[in-house]
């Protein structure tokens, strides 16, 4: 599926200042459209993870507004906030799986926002949602691991289970916060290929934080450079020249992400 001009993520003069006075984000204006594959790059502590976590409000911002599909997640509360977050799948560097549970049970937790707590505890998922989980595992080519315990999988397989979990959520957006940081090159390619296929074939908007500029240039349609909490570059991959990349990574930022 191709990109559209429909904005799914909007930052309107967004700033984040931590209680200790450290500036996480400074006056960020940003629009990401449906179907884009955006990679955010910058030094550790530049604010990449802060930006990512502002999208689904894992971090509250200090100023400005963040909108998802035109609706303010900054101002949302209760059920309205839950409904917005249902649209946003999240993949973490640390996988965040329940090691002693099966792959299937882990993937089904992607439906947590659709069930009352007691049904989740008892594992009372509908046949339709179980099919969603199987389909998601098929997408990442792990359908043969349905009943395998998560802690019996390799790191790359665990990250692909995390991708399947995000897919089971039926999101319009997937956020990937350093998804390949602990993976070897071969496994990195597998995970990034999965994300690109999901983006291209399903039309799901992908926003990823990556340390590797080479991987970013290989997979992104657009690169955003963050330095000291500020957006210093935003454009197509072809415009991210060596000089621009060097400027994004210049300086010595304090850890804030």
Swiss-Prot record:
Print the keywords alphabetically: ATP-binding, Cell membrane, Membrane, Nucleotide-binding, Phosphonate transport, Translocase, Transport
What does the sequence similarity comment in the record state about its family?
A: Belongs to the ABC transporter superfamily. Phosphonates importer (TC 3.A.1.9.1) family.
| Enzyme nomenclature, EC number | 7.3.2.2
The protein's role, per its UniProt record? Part of the ABC transporter complex PhnCDE involved in phosphonates import. Responsible for energy coupling to the transport system.
- Describe the location of the ABC transporter domain by residue ranges: 9-253
**Predominant subcellular localization, coarse grouping:** membrane
Please state what the protein is called: Phosphonates import ATP-binding protein PhnC
CDD domains associated with the record:
ABC_PhnC_transporter
Q: Where in the cell is it found?
A: Cell membrane
Q: What GO molecular functions are on record for this protein?
A: ABC-type phosphonate transporter activity; ATP binding; ATP hydrolysis activity
Q: What does the annotation say about its assembly with partners?
A: The complex is composed of two ATP-binding proteins (PhnC), two transmembrane proteins (PhnE) and a solute-binding protein (PhnD).
**What reactions does this protein catalyze?**
phosphonate(out) + ATP + H2O = phosphonate(in) + ADP + phosphate + H(+)
Give TM segment ranges.
none
Q: Which GO terms describe its cellular component?
A: plasma membrane
- InterPro entries assigned to the protein according to its UniProt record, in alphabetical order: AAA+_ATPase (IPR003593), ABC_transporter-like_ATP-bd (IPR003439), ABC_transporter-like_CS (IPR017871), ABC_transpr_PhnC (IPR012693), MetN_ABC_transporter-like (IPR050086), P-loop_NTPase (IPR027417)
- The domain of life is Bacteria
- Binding residues annotated for ATP, in chain numbering: 42-49
Gene name? phnC
């Amino acid at each position: 599926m191709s990109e559209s001009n429909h904005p799914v993520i909007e930052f309107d003069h967004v700033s984040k200042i931590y209680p200790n006075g450290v500036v996480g984000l400074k006056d960020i204006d940003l629009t990401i459209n449906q179907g884009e594959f955006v990679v955010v790059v910058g030094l550790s502590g530049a604010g990449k993870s802060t930006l990512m976590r502002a999208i689904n409000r894992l971090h509250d911002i200090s100023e400005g507004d963040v909108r998802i599909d035109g609706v303010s997640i900054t101002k949302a509360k209760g059920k309205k906030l839950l409904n917005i977050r249902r649209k946003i799948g999240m993949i973490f560097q640390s996988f965040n799986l329940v090691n002693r549970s099966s792959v299937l049970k882990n993937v089904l937790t992607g439906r947590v926002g659709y069930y009352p707590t007691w049904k989740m505890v008892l594992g009372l998922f509908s046949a339709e949602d179980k099919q969603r989980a199987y389909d998601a595992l098929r997408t990442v080519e792990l359908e043969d691991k349905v009943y395998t315990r998560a802690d019996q999988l390799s790191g790359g397989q665990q990250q692909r289970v995390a991708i399947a979990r995000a897919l089971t959520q039926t999101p319009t957006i997937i956020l990937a916060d350093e998804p390949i940081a602990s993976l070897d090159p071969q496994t990195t390619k597998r995970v990034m290929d999965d994300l690109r296929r999901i983006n291209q074939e399903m039309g799901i908007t992908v926003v990823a934080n990556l340390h590797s500029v080479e991987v970013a240039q290989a997979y992104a349609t657009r690169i955003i450079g963050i330095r000291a909490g500020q957006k210093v570059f935003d454009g197509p991959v072809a415009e991210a020249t060596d000089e621009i990349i060097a400027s994004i990574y210049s300086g010595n930022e304090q850890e804030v992400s």
